[in-house]
């Protein structure tokens, strides 16, 4: 679903797409949400992204991403071998499983970004989230 679909009746909700590492934002936002993109950044840029999310948010930051481990890599391999066999999907899914951060690495990135008193939790299906209130 495209941004704005379910929130079309709420003019106080807005969306903005930009390169977060270069964007000169004139204002802060209530919520900074980063979903399933952190693993596309190298460690240093991931730290910059987390720092930037904290700077942009007035209230809450939520970062949800893949959690690297054997189950993720085995599951992705099987799914892309048996079901999702398109070459681009196969390549991207397997690369994402390799590049995902482990639970400890995600915590370390948040610490390097200067996050204090943040929460971090594992979820099913090789997911994890960190958040800052």
Where are these regions (language model features)?
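C-terminal alpha-helical "lid/dimerization" subdomain adjacent to the S-adenosyl-L-methionine
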Residues: 66-115, 119
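Hydrophobic adenine-recognition pocket in adenosine-nucleotide-binding enzymes
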Residues: 37
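Short conserved loop adjoining the S-adenosyl-L-methionine
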Residues: 22-27, 43
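C-terminal lobe and adjacent flexible extensions of AdoMet/dcAdoMet transferase-like proteins
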Residues: 124-133
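A conserved beta-strand element that flanks and buttresses the S-adenosyl-L-methionine
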Residues: 33-34
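A structural motif
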Residues: 10, 57-58, 115
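Class I SAM-dependent methyltransferase SAM/SAH-binding core
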Residues: 1-23
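Conserved beta-strand signature within the Rossmann-like core of class I S-adenosyl-L-methionine
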Residues: 50-68
């Amino acid at each position: 679903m495209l941004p704005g679909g379910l929130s079309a009746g709420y003019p106080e909700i807005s969306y903005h797409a930009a390169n977060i590492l270069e964007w000169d934002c004139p204002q802060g936002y209530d919520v900074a949400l980063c979903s399933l993109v952190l693993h596309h950044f190298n460690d240093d840029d991931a730290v910059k992204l987390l720092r930037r999310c904290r700077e942009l948010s007035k209230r809450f930051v939520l970062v949800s991403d893949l959690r690297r481990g054997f189950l993720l890599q085995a599951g992705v391999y099987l799914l892309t071998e048996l079901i999702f066999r398109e070459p681009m999907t196969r390549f991207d899914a397997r690369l994402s499983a390799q590049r995902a951060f482990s639970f400890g690495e995600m915590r370390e990135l948040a610490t390097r970004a200067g996050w204090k008193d943040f929460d971090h939790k594992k979820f099913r299906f090789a997911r994890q989230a960190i958040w800052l209130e």
